Design a protein with these regions (language model features):
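Mature catalytic core of soluble alpha/beta enzymes
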Residues: 1-160
């Protein structure tokens, strides 16, 4: 596990991302292809924010050799086939979103998962939010404002 990190194991996490000594916290991003507790990257965050992740790797079942996850595409009624494995959203817990940052980050992580990386990044830009998108080919897309705060930990992944 990364030193001085918050392991993001819940649907969403709210925290003041400054430690008592004033340094940033590191939020670990789960490796969707790895064992539970293995991380593919970390995001260093300061300030107060809510962080949410939607992924296809924890809640699923296999029937007739096909894997079905829990994130449904409302246009088909079936599990999303956006090509993504995981989407992590960072929503500042301040300004106009202060009261609803947790709900917004959770909703946006699911919406962006269904939309796919390109449309999901566009949606985040409209809302002024940040995110990390991981696709099935282990390609990672990171929004511009947190690109310098994201560290890739796993050599099998590449950043777009």
């Amino acid at each position: 596990n990364p030193d001085n990190s918050l392991a993001h194991r819940t649907t969403w996490l709210r925290s003041d991302f400054s430690k008592p000594d004033g340094t940033d916290w590191s939020v670990a991003v789960q490796d969707p292809e790895g064992e539970e507790g293995s991380y593919m990257g970390v995001i260093n965050l300061s300030g107060t924010a809510c962080v949410s992740t939607s992924g296809d790797y924890e809640k699923y079942f296999i029937q007739d050799g096909k894997r079905y996850h829990h994130i449904l595409d409302p246009s088909t009624g079936y599990p999303s086939e956006s090509g993504l494995s995981s989407v992590t959203i960072i929503c500042p817990d301040e300004g106009e979103w202060k009261q609803d940052a947790g709900l917004l980050s959770d909703g946006l992580s699911t919406a962006c998962f269904v939309l796919g990386a390109e449309k999901g990044m566009e949606l985040l830009e409209e809302y002024g939010m940040e995110g990390v998108f991981i696709d099935k080919k282990k390609q990672v897309s990171v929004t511009e404002c947190i690109a310098d705060r994201f560290t890739l930990l796993h050599s099998e992944y590449t950043i777009n």
